Amino acid sequence: MFRTRLISGIVIVLLTLGLMMKGGIVLAAALCVISLIAMYEFYRATGVTTQEPKKINAFEVVGLIGVVVYYAILVSPVNELYLLLTLITLLITLMFVYVFTFPKYHARQLMAAFYGIVYAPVLMSFIYLTRMLPHGEYIVWLIFISSWMNDTCAYCVGVLIGKHKLAPKLSPHKSVEGSIGGVVGAAIVAGLFAFFLVEKVMQEQAIVPVFVL
């Protein structure tokens, strides 16, 4: 088990490193695929996906097509306002599906279908947007470093001094102390990363507090 996790972890790190260095349409395509998988799993977990085998419903079709269109616009040389218009169009389309097929779908499926688009694909696209910023090849690592250090610090602090449960029913092993330790640890490491690496590249002192936040 440990060996499998170690190997998979190394592979993921190498792939992440390669994609972040490459950037551009290759990174966007990879994020699009990951987003589609994540959204599909979210749809399954929230009941958007139909229970009938080998069948997909209209909400899934709108979501899948919408994500591909969203990423196509993301990499195209158009105003980023079109990304917002795409999301609004997807919401209206989902509402049309709900109204004209009523009562086939529940309102909660409609809400989950739209939230699934925002939760995975849209948030994932910020990796691409960050990477495409000036000096983005350095800045983008703050996303991963902050996430990794938050998990690591939260685990270590929770194991050492965690006594108060954060959400006993949802996640019984997480503690208040661990969650605070994760946030503080991630902020400190992100600040150090910005100060010692990104700061040297960009030569803008004001950038450090922005990155920490």
PLM ranges: what are they?
Residues F2-V212:
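Membrane-embedded alpha-helical bundles of polytopic integral membrane proteins
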